[in-house]
Amino acid sequence: MRFYTSVCRIGNNICVREQTDTGPNKYKVKYEPTLYTTSNAESGIKTLYGDDVKPVKPGTMSACRDYIKQYKDVGGFRVFGQTDYVLAYINEFYPEEIHFDIKRISAWVLDIETFLPEDENGRITGFPHPEDADAPINLIALQDLHTRQVYSFGYREFTGKADTKYINCGTEKEMLKQVVLFWNQKSVEICTGWNVDGFDILFLYNRIVKVLGVEWANKLSPWETVEVKKSTFRGKDQYKVIIYGVTVLDYMELYKKFSMSKQESYSLSHISLEELGEDKLDHSEYKNFNDFARRGWNEKFVPYNARDCQLVGKLDDKLKLLELAMTISFLAKINFDNVFGPVRTWDAIIHNALLKENKVIPLKDQDGDSHESIEGAYVKDPKVGFIRWPISIDAESLYPSNAIMLNMSPETYLGMVECSLEMMLKGISPTPGEMECLSPIGAKFRKDFQGIIPRLFEGLKITRKAVKKEMLQLKQQYEIDKDKTLPSKISALDNKQQALKILLNSAYGALGNKGFRFYNPNIAESITILGQYALKIIEAELDAILCKRFKMPEGTKFVVYCDTDSVFFEMGPVVDKYFAGKEKAVIVKALEKIAVDIIQHEVDHLMEKVSKMTNAYKKTLYFKLENVGDIALWVSKKKYIVRVHSSEGVTYAKPKYKVMGLDIVKSSTPAWVRTKLKGSLDLIFDTDESTVQKFLADSRADFIKLPVDQIAFPRGANNIDSFANPVTIYNSRSEGTTPMHVRAALLYNYHVKKLGLDGTYPLIPSGSKIRFVYLKMPNVINENIIGFPADEHLPEELGLDQYIDRDLQFDKTMVASMQNILDAIGWNAVEVSSLDAFFG
């Protein structure tokens, strides 16, 4: 077994760290890449479009850059090849499928603690800035992700108890030295942690530079090369530490990328509670963080730091996001930290696949001057209100399947003819040539060979299906014989099939990105509009077909909603006619059979029609049963609730709710309110208006007693500096209306600083998560709202608790959210007399 853990470029050298059968290895090589140029002679190597090219070796990577520049404007002379030389090297020297063992990778969780900056009188002056490292580090924890052992490095003696090996370094300077030496001794290959990219690693590196010098700081890299890159995002400077030879994988960013769930806060505290039911150690009994560090050192501070590492370790035990990222990386042959963007990932996949076929890629267009907008998916106006006995079907991997179906790829693209989706739906679109596919927007694709992109998509789909099948077989085997060798194999296969799924789902993100080497707006839009065609032909023709099949009155509507890759049907009339009086379980099973045997069958016929109209390369559009419910409620496009009894053939003992787009599932709704709203769904579906109104009245009484942070609105506060005014705090209407939550954040910052509390409480920086509440007027700040950081409490010193308008807060959160749902069925969330008062 041989696999890389880091491949990086330093000057003209490629620097490699890898794991082999004999252990870890690292080496540096002066890499001379291969480029390709146009050729009149047969060479056995061709471009994506079939032209002959020949290999050239200009020399070093710098020489290659100069070579490309030299011939850039020479007519009739073109250069081809992968100019991301790290990716080229990985593919060249790791040509086979890569198998890896995560346990052989030196992976560590990092968490640091710092003092807050103080003036000469010991007064806290704010919070530390990682780009300046303007406060001493007092504690550093590193946890081995495999053994789960935590090592804590501190500047003073520790006499308390903690689940860590404590090293008393005596001073900050010695502590930083010991950490660097330990880092090298353990040959750290991956460093993770919560917001480690945004704070810990940046602060640690800059602090080492400040205290020990850049030579010591650069020892964090096995190549003694570290770079701090500065960029600007939304007007805010951002810094990223690049430690050559070590991959920093921020677990918070992995969670945001791969967890598939939106959270009202991405603090470690919130996510740990959500995922593990565990929290960080509370230290609210101390005056401020410096007081906590000094007085609580032995009792809580050292355990607090260690626990942060342990929580990240436990999250990875459950979620296995590090292994998932590695699996994607090795499938694509990219570095671990490249997994966050689809463009580089798919650039590598396509380049590597083509090179195996002796084909080369064109140089990437550096201009990126395409300004076309791509039309997206189809969403049908729904039937608003209750839907009885809903069934939903969804397309299998819609966008990859569309690309396969019409053989959409740069080298198969033949240009455009006059055609539209409306023409195709009416059956008056032009007839494509025998060896041509025609998309609904008029893009033509050749059929005499399969293009690289559909070929890759199809290969990934087939591989994932096989891997998933093997995984399920091993799961079944484990249930029978409990073979202890199987769980690790099952986990590896599960990660691989998840990685393949993620790669497939991310493909359109690359194809529709103007920075992608193979970007073509006509291909990208052909993919989305073919999806529209599939849904619209179902909407247009299936109702009449089902009326005949079920012997229903002409004009009966079955298709009630379509969205991107899903179609929803109302089967209430069928249930009334054929299953009246039957138990729900019997009806659910009957509808499953109807969905598979009748609806899917008829949809397959319609997809055959789509295939014929487009002269498809192969039929790949298939729809399968998703959910069967007994009732649903549609509010508007992308906003609905379905009570699901069966999902993909699996029947639930107790039905589950699928909620889309409503405040019940939005992270901008307080968690307590979301929970209450979810608890009201059975009442909405099974009782009456007055029962729902009573539920709300009872909930108000509970709401009034809650702490402020539980009733406040969660929001993201972006670009707050652009709305700030040094005189009036925030922009007036004449200067451009300041969003309410931004105004709340600016007011908090102003009054915290005004009272000299900015050393005790963190200010709200632009881009952070906040909470805000309404205030009764008049009050001590003469404003109707106030905000505070999402993971903090509203400071008592502001004197605002007595002014919090809890009734208005309830109306704006709970009542308004409920009314948005009830409007669809003509109910009122509160009694009419109360409602009149609510709306003034």
Where are these regions (language model features)?
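DnaQ-like (DEDDh/DEDDy) 3′-5′ exonuclease domain used for proofreading
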Residues: 1-187, 306-307, 311-330, 337-376, ...
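Active-site-proximal helix-loop-helix substrate-binding element of RNase H-like nuclease domains
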Residues: 150-153, 160-166, 187, 191, ...
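Proline-aspartate-enriched helix->loop->beta-strand connector
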Residues: 179-203
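Active-site palm subdomain of RNA-directed nucleic acid polymerases
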Residues: 280, 535-564
